Amino acid sequence: MTDSEPQTLNNNSEITANHNDDILEYLSVDDYDYELPDQLIARYPLAQRSASKLLYLPTNNANSQVEDKLFSELPDILNAGDLIVFNDTKVMKARLFGQKDTGGKIEVLIERLVSLSDVNSAYLDEIIANSKTIDTTIIAEKHIALCHIKASKALKLGQGLVLADGHMTGIMIGRQENLFILAFDTPILPDLEQYGELPIPPYFERHADATDNTRYQTVFHDPAKLASVAAPTASLHFDDIVLEKLAAKGIQTAFVTLHVGAGTFAPVKTDNLLNHTMHSEYAHLPQATAELINQTHANGKQVIAIGTTVTRVLETAYQQTAVDGQSLSGWSGDTDIFIYPGFKFGVVDKLLTNFHLPKSTLLMLVSAFATKKSIEQAYQHAIKSQYRFFSYGDAMLLDKQVD
């Protein structure tokens, strides 16, 4: 199998978390709540990427305790022959502002581009016949997107909108669950890069600025993979200095892709985790990366996932492709994997991640990886020690642990 012919998954409902049914603790969303002083929310990045702090949770043993370190010390913790796996996605300038054709203000967040064939043709024919906003005869591939909408009144089918001071015009041509399907009369991605705003997290409580355009992207993103609406934030700590130190020590690097959706910020709205519907995101594990992972484990070395996005890709691919629970193969498709305590990890040995929002699926994932008790203690220590939280905050390095 080659990278150009990955295994695909057309029905993401087939992806089910590999949980131990005997573990029924920590299924209430309230189990993942905590109080965070507002001043510990990092709303701006540090001057240097790798200047952040690093809280290390080593493998549990009788004397195991958290260790306070600097992120620049990461190469000293890892061993030659270990493999670091990054997410090489790039964040779109996906936020747009403008007006509906009725004059009301509107905010649009592009979630992902979709194909013309995904749109109900009956809708499209009717809208083309009645549209007064845009020339719908030139709607084509790369002109249609699933979007989140903020407006005083809901956008109606066939309603037009004018965005970015008139540089972009569009029309609502359908719905997909809680998302709106918008069609534009020009290709979307070039317009976003010129007129859009980087969709920094809502808890920053500000608009994106020029610094964010650089610092809310990883240094190794692939420009061709412009499709995320949030950064893989664990990777934001890496700069050329740290990458060079890792290479000098003989630590390998590889890449996967997961295009991060706005669902990463969505709260869990059900009291019981088992009733939560996980958002879906496109993911890709190249065959070359799968082979490196297989070889790393065969050599007795560790695979380090940089962030929850990488973890979700690798563990999804493990469920879909691993032969006898061992060898991975290349894979691509949509993943809606939901990882919470009781999950049995098949690939990841260490996880580098940031500190996550209360009651979030990301906090549930790290609790599954390092145990709920260890994460609670680590967060208490981090708050007491004035660590910086969330996307621009400090990092944690977790060893896979078991209760």
Swiss-Prot record:
Main location: cytoplasm
Gene designation per UniProt: queA
One of the record's GO molecular function terms: S-adenosylmethionine:tRNA ribosyltransferase-isomerase activity
Catalytic activity: 7-aminomethyl-7-carbaguanosine(34) in tRNA + S-adenosyl-L-methionine = epoxyqueuosine(34) in tRNA + adenine + L-methionine + 2 H(+)
EC number(s) on file: 2.4.99.17
Hydrolase keyword on record: no
GO cellular component, one term: cytoplasm
Pfam families membership: Queuosine_synth
Subcellular location: Cytoplasm
Assembly mode: Monomer.
Top-level EC class: transferase
Pathway as given in its UniProt record: tRNA modification; tRNA-queuosine biosynthesis
Name of protein: S-adenosylmethionine:tRNA ribosyltransferase-isomerase
Function: Transfers and isomerizes the ribose moiety from AdoMet to the 7-aminomethyl group of 7-deazaguanine (preQ1-tRNA) to give epoxyqueuosine (oQ-tRNA).
Keywords: Cytoplasm, Queuosine biosynthesis, S-adenosyl-L-methionine, Transferase
GO biological process: queuosine biosynthetic process; tRNA wobble guanine modification
Family: Belongs to the QueA family.
